[in-house]
């Protein structure tokens, strides 16, 4: 009961008491709510108390206090069949009394808080300390002229070399005097303020963008409710107490409530309780449904009784917010803080062992390929900058000591301390220049810009790093239905009464079918389809029929209408709440069955079971088949083979999905004579509806339907683009192999003459598993490179394939895999994939929660667009790197050489401010906003191991840096002679700006600005102007930069340390700037392939767990490992879509604990006693369930032999030990011996345990 201990610990803290008790409602408000509650007959407190009960206690309280669910419906003024009337006044009144279905979000960081966060940067702290020391020492006046001259020289050196791109003095330079030495220290502090403000503004803007994205995700969540007798989808936030909600397979329950109707409904409550088994819900045994849990099987209806902060999700969020714990840490402080926000929670609910915690951290620190390589590159740059800074410091200190103490034989004085501080500032400044501080901004801009644009291309990105990871994808495992096809199902062929109707126009009319075939077929389809599947006839000419719900079932319902029937009228005869039993479709059974009462002459005489599903599977369960005379005939093995080969295979080869419809009748003994196809029973208690195997046999086949799902016309072109881009597309589908192969041929996944594999799931498993049934990576490596189609695939097969491709080292470049999924069971595969795509239309909440990107149109072409945007992000960051590193190299070398040669720098501090502004902010905006082009799909993926900076980029960086350095040093050392102007070398500290140094500055900026155009191409392209006109942002920034440079040079004066230049000098600078374009063409002629392979940076596969770059763009540390069974290990909120999103936002925005404490304070108080009652009731319920299982086991043991019982006990113990190992728990000595003994006897696949 680790989870209970955690809740107790949180509840008992002072923080919880303060937060939960800090909310007080005014007497007037309470009085108003009490008055409204009397109108409904049930107060908020009554419902909250009722929801604390579990199992039998909940049933008893519901029955005694409210006369059952129907009585509670009456008190809440709702109807279990019709629902609420939907009037806005009624909905508002319910929200006023019982609350809205929203959880108050955490207050976003204010600008002042962001400023304080920016001040925590270690580099800025060092500079602030240096500034204060410098400022304090500046007021000391040296006593000797020699010391005064020395101090002036040092001041000149440091003022010139201060190269943090943000150092600027706002005071006009004085002409002389030691009394102004304080300006340098003040300038340092002022420029730190500028840095902090720029950082805070950037973070504030970025936070607003992330909030906008988060709202987009959350507002897209809808749920089906019944209002005014009609089923409608409403936003989750619009749900109110009293709503009748329809629960279906894959739904995330958005509120608490009681079950009204259950069709084999099973719920995954592991996110709340840690219980790994799916809980079967029924009105008789366990009717309580809790928010934050998932419907894993079946369907049903529920009465909503608690929403928002009063639901289980809201209560937990209130506790988490008040407890100041478990949500996450500020990910701007360290790598571990950004990655352990989730793992710390899971660790607290596990054994607490270090091994387990470490494993969780390792999973959560996984970054994308690009982020990992950028982190490694940043470290390499910092190492180089640190080395240069240390060398500069050693040279300056050594030279000063030799000159001052050895040669001049001076004594040590306070001035010397000031000089050493100056030298230290110079070294720190060189280090600051080398740090790629603009890199996180460029990444954030590229990602957020791309994410906004991708929304227009039907890609809703949930995790920002997924969009650039997609650019590296080498393999796509795609579903068929709805992704490659239109998902508009139509029955175009059928096999009825021994006749094969081969076209849609040739389909028969129901009245013309012999015997009772027509009515039985239409009833079998209408009743045995989910009642939320329906077709809406067009209201205007030219419109198509609208299909709602499951598209396969909609195709069958359309077939009923074409037969002359009315599926809606048939359903009225069999209301959903009167259905005896529903066995919903699942991937293992491959069929759906519905049991309805069967009557003759107005008298119920038994039951009829309708079945539909995969044709070869359902037909194999049939013992009879309706023939041409309308009567059932024995279905022999030979007849079954004939139908399979001539009908099913022929339809499948035409790309049709084949569905078999069957039925059987169960007649009560004594009502009438039983026919040969019917089954007799004595009493209702004799029928075990839970025995699916008994139900799933002895059917009579009615018809086989061939359903056409046309391939999307744009898909073949998109797949051809993927092939050209070096991306392998694989189709994973549940259809049979022939249908799958035919669709693959239509999509050009398979083409004539290619030696690729198309396998069924069964054969796939036989080929990849060893003699013990375990997946062999070696065998899998022999299969997956040639595999293109996987048919009749189970979700576990998809997971095995994805995991095998990702883990494989069979190819030189490790594969990066994208996966599409829509079902609940696709969750593990979506999580395991590098990028998971969920279907926005057909996808379940489970699939969407597990995904990285949601396809809002379920279209494969949107995936191709995601690839383009991903590669565009990669290219945008590469362009910025190429540009920034060139400027970095030139600036660092210039500052270093100036410091160690003439104790002066050609670039002043204010010049470096402007250059860094160009290099960081403006270049980020200009280069990170390029539009993607189809040319991006003409290159192969980068892969996991390819260098971040290619030989071409290294060539460009070094060649352009060398060219610029030569020009700068020529002007620096010989410019006065060349231009006939006064030299700026060895000028006094407070001398007015010189044309000499202004020429150096202007030439450098002109070359930098023109080189920004060169930086637009990173793959050796000749035409650097291609696409320039379409990038308005780049053009505006470039022109603005150019004009600003003219103003700074001509009118900046002492403020910008510039002197106006003549027209001739401007022409020279412009020529030098333009010459970089010509030089770029010369550099492009150097073949990159002939350069040394060592000219690569960031090559090899990166292990990013311990790498970090400022955390700005690491929005969420995503776990890529498959989720193990979560019994006792997972925090309650794991698996909750809404809560999970909110926690990710908290981590993305770097919320501090104090802010998290405020989260949830607006929620109504939940007392510690109430929380303890909740836990106690659940413990009591689980104990009751344990006793029931124990009693069942004892009964079984009394019937079975002692050997069988012993075998079962050993198996259970083995499974328990394996789960302990999976959770990181240790075994005692006896358990270890038993585990080793049973290891070879029991074939247990760990992957199956993870999935099942």
Curated annotation (Swiss-Prot):
Residues 1143-1152 are annotated as: Calmodulin-binding subdomain B. Residues 333-357 have a biased composition (Low complexity). Residues 143-180, 398-422, 901-908, 982-989, 1057-1065 are extracellular. Ca(2+) 2 binds at residues 888, 920. It is found in: Cell membrane. Its EC number is 7.2.2.10. Keywords: ATP-binding, Calcium, Calcium transport, Calmodulin-binding, Cell membrane, Glycoprotein, Ion transport, Magnesium, Membrane, Metal-binding, Nucleotide-binding, Translocase, Transmembrane, Transmembrane helix, Transport. Residues 1124-1142 are annotated as: Calmodulin-binding subdomain A. Residues 1-121, 202-376, 444-879, 930-960, 1011-1035, 1087-1252 are cytoplasmic. Residues 330-361, 1181-1252 are annotated as: Disordered. It is a multi-pass membrane protein. It catalyses: Ca(2+)(in) + ATP + H2O = Ca(2+)(out) + ADP + phosphate + H(+). It comes from the Eukaryota. Glycans are attached at residues 155, 164. ATP binds at residues 481, 553, 612, 733-735, 792, 798, 825. The active site is at residue 479. The chain crosses the membrane at residues 122-142, 181-201, 377-397, 423-443, 880-900, 909-929, 961-981, 990-1010, 1036-1056, 1066-1086. One of its GO terms (cellular component) is plasma membrane. GO terms for biological process: calcium ion transport; intracellular calcium ion homeostasis; regulation of cytosolic calcium ion concentration. Belongs to the cation transport ATPase (P-type) (TC 3.A.3) family. Type IIB subfamily. Catalyzes the hydrolysis of ATP coupled with the transport of calcium across a membrane. This is Plasma membrane calcium-transporting ATPase mca-1. It comes from Caenorhabditis elegans. The lineage of its organism: Eukaryota, Metazoa, Ecdysozoa, Nematoda, Chromadorea.
């Amino acid at each position: 009961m680790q989870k209970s201990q955690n809740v107790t610990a949180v509840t008992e803290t002072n923080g919880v008491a303060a937060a939960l008790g800090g909310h007080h409602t005014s007497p007037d408000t309470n009085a108003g709510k009490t008055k409204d509650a009397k109108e409904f007959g049930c107060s908020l407190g009554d419902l909250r108390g009722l929801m604390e009960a579990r199992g039998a206690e909940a049933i008893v309280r519901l029955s005694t206090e409210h006369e059952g669910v129907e009585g509670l419906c009456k008190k809440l003024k709702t109807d279990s069949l019709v629902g609420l009337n939907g009037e806005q006044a009624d909905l508002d009144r319910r929200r006023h009394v019982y609350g809205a279905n929203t959880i108050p979000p955490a207050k976003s960081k204010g600008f002042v808080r962001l400023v304080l966060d920016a001040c925590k940067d270690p580099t800025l702290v060092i500079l602030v300390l240096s500034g204060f020391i410098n400022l304090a020492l500046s007021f000391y006046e040296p006593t000797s002229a020699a010391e005064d001259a020395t101090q002036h020289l040092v001041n000149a050196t440091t003022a010139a070399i201060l190269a943090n791109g943000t150092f600027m003095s706002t005071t006009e330079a004085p002409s002389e005097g030691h009394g102004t030495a304080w300006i340098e220290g003040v300038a340092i502090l002022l420029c730190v303020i500028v840095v902090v403000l720029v950082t805070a503004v950037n973070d504030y803007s970025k936070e607003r963008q992330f909030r906008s994205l988060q709202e987009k995700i959350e507002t897209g969540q809808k749920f089906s409710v019944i209002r005014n007798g009609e089923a409608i989808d409403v936003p989750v936030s619009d749900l109110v107490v009293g709503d009748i909600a329809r629960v279906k397979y894959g739904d995330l329950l958005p509120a608490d409530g009681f079950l009204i109707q259950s069709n084999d409904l099973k719920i995954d409550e592991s996110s709340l309780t840690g219980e790994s088994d799916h809980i079967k819900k029924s009105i008789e045994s366990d009717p309580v449904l809790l928010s934050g849990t998932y419907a894993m099987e079946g369907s049903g209806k529920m009465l909503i009784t608690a929403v928002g902060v009063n639901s289980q999700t809201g209560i937990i969020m209130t506790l988490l917010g008040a407890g100041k714990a478990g949500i996450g840490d500020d990910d701007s402080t360290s790598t571990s803080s950004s990655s352990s926000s989730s793992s710390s929670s899971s660790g607290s609910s596990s054994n607490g062992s270090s091994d387990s915690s470490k494993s969780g951290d390792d999973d959560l620190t996984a970054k994308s390929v690009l982020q990992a390589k950028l982190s490694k590159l940043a470290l390499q740059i910092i190492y180089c900058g640190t080395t240069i800074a240390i060398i500069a410091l050693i040279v300056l200190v050594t030279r000063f000591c030799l000159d001052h103490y050895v040669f001049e034989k001076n004594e040590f004085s306070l001035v010397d301390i000031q000089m050493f501080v100056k030298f230290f500032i110079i070294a720190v400044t060189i280090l600051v220049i080398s740090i790629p501080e603009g890199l996180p901004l460029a990444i954030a801009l590229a990602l957020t810009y791309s994410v906004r644009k991708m929304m227009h291309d039907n890609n809703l990105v949930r995790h920002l790093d997924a969009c650039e990871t997609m650019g590296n994808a080498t393999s796509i495992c795609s579903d068929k239905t709805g992704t490659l096809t239109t998902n508009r199902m139509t029955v175009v062929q059928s096999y009825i009464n021994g006749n094969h109707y081969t076209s849609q126009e040739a389909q028969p009319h129901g009245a013309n079918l012999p015997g009772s075939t027509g009515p039985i077929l239409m009833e079998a389809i209408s009743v045995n389809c989910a009642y939320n599947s329906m077709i809406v006839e067009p209201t205007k000419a030219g419109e198509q029929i609208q299909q709602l719900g499951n598209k396969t079932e909609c195709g069958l319902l359309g077939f009923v209408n074409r037969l002359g029937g009315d599926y809606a009228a048939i359903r009225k005869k069999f209301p959903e709440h009167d259905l005896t039993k529903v066995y919903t479709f699942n991937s293992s059974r491959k069929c759906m069955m519905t049991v309805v009462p069967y009557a003759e002459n107005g008298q119920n005489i038994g039951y009829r079971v309708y079945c539909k599903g995969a044709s070869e599977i359902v037909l194999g369960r049939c013992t009879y088949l309706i023939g041409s005379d309308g009567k059932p005939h024995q279905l022999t093995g030979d007849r079954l083979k004939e139908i399979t080969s001539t009908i099913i295979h022929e339809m499948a080869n035409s790309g049709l999905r084949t569905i078999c419809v069957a039925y059987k009748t169960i007649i009560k003994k004594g009502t009438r004579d039983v026919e040969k196809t019917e089954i007799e029973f004595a009493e209702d208690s004799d029928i075990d509806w839970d025995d699916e195997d008994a139900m799933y046999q002895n059917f009579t086949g009615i018809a086989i339907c061939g359903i056409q799902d046309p391939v999307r016309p744009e898909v073949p072109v998109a797949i051809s683009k993927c092939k050209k881009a070096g991306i392998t597309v694989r189709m994973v589908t549940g259809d049979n192999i022939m249908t799958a192969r035919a669709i693959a041929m239509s999509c050009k996944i398979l083409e004539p003459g290619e030696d690729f594999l198309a396998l069924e799931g069964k054969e796939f498993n036989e080929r990849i598993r060893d003699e013990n049934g375990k997946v062999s990576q070696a065998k899998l490596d022999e299969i997956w490179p040639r595999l293109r189609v996987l048919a009749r695939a189970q979700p576990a097969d998809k997971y095995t394939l994805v995991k095998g491709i990702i883990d494989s080292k069979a190819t030189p470049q490790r594969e990066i895999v994208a996966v599409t999924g829509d079902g609940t069971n696709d969750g593990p595969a979506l999580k395991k994939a590098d990028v998971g795509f969920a279907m926005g239309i057909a996808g379940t909440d489970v699939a969407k929660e597990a995904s990285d990107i949601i396809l809002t149109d379920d279209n494969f072409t949107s995936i191709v667009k995601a690839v383009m945007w991903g590669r565009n992000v990669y290219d945008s960051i590469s362009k910025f790197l190429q540009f920034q590193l060139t400027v970095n190299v030139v600036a660092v070398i210039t500052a270093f050489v100036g410091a160690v040669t003439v104790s002066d720098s050609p670039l002043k501090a204010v010049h470096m401010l402007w250059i860094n502004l160009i290099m960081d902010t403006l270049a980020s905006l200009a280069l990170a906003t390029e539009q993607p082009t189809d040319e991006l799909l003409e290159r192969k993926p980068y892969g996991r191991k390819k260098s971040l900076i290619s030989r071409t980029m290294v060539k460009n960086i070094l060649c352009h840096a060398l060219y610029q350095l030569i020009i700068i040093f020529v002007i620096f050392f010989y410019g006065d002679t060349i231009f006939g102007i006064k030299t700026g070398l060895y000028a006094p500290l407070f001398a007015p700006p010189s044309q000499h140094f202004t020429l150096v500055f202007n030439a450098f900026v002109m070359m930098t600005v023109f080189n920004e155009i060169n930086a637009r191409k990173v793959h050796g392209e000749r035409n650097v102007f291609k696409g320039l006109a379409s990038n308005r942002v780049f053009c505006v920034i470039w022109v603005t930069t150019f004009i600003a440079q003219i103003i700074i040079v001509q009118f900046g004066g002492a403020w910008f340390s510039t002197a106006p230049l003549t027209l001739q000098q401007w022409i020279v600078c412009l020529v030098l700037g333009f010459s970089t374009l010509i030089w770029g063409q010369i550099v492009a002629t150097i073949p990159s392939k002939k350069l040394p392979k060592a000219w690569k940076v960031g090559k090899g596969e990166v292990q990013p767990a311990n790498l970090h770059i400022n955390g700005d763009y690491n929005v969420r540390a995503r776990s890529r490992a498959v989720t193990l069974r979560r019994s006792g290990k997972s925090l309650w909120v794991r698996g909750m879509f809404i809560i999970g999103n909110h926690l990710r936002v908290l981590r993305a925005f770097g919320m501090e604990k104090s802010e998290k404490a405020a989260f949830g304070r607006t929620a109504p108080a939940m007392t510690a006693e109430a929380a303890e009652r909740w836990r106690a009731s659940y413990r009591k319920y689980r104990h009751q369930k344990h006793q029931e299982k124990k009693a069942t086991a004892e009964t079984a043991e009394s019937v079975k032999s002692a050997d069988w019982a012993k075998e079962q006990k050993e198996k259970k113990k083995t499974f328990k030990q394996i789960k302990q190992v999976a959770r990181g728990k240790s075994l005692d000595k006896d358990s270890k011996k038993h585990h080793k003994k049973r290891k070879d006897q029991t074939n247990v696949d760990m992957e199956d345990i993870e999935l099942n």
